[in-house]
Amino acid sequence: RQLRVVMTLSQIEQLLELPAKIPREKQAPPWQALRDTAILELFYSTGLRLAELAALEVRDLENLSDTLRVVGKGSKERLVPIGSHAMKAIEAYRQAAKVTDGPLFVSKLRKRLSTRTINSLLKKYLRHSDIPFNITPHKLRHSFATHLLDAGADLRSVQALLGHSSLSTTQIYT
C-alpha cells in the first residue's frame, strides 16, 4: 500500500486562503469565494466525507452552537464540533448568499452543490496553488485526522469525529 498523503499546516493555510485570492469568473455569484472558503474550512475543521458535506442542510447547524449534525455512512447520525474559523466562514457565506433554509451549500441557481461540483472546485483551487500533489476531499479528511492525532487527541475521539464504526479503520491514521 502507498503511504497516505497528509498536507502540512502551511499547505492547509494556503488552500484555505485561495478562494479569496483568485478572481471570480464573470458568471459566478458574488458570494462564491465566501461559499468556497466555508466549504474548505468545514472540510478541514471537521474531517467530513465529501457526501456528508454535500448533504448538509441549514437545519443541521441550527440550534446547535458550533456543532453540526451529520448523517454518515449507514444513515448513522453524529454530532461534530465546528472550529471557530469554519463557523465564521459559514456565517459570512450564509449572510452574503441569504441561505436561510434547505441545502447549506448552493449554486447560483440555489441548487444543492453535487459531490462532483465540490470536487471540481477543490481541483480548481489546487491548480492555483503550489501544492505538489493531487488533493482530494478524502486527503483533507486524512490530514484532519492525522493533525488531531499528532496534537495528542486519543484514537477513540478521532474515531467518533470521523464516524468510523471500527477502531481499526481509524488506526490507519497512526
Which sequence ranges carry the predicted segments?
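Conserved catalytic core of the tyrosine transesterase superfamily
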Residues: 1-174
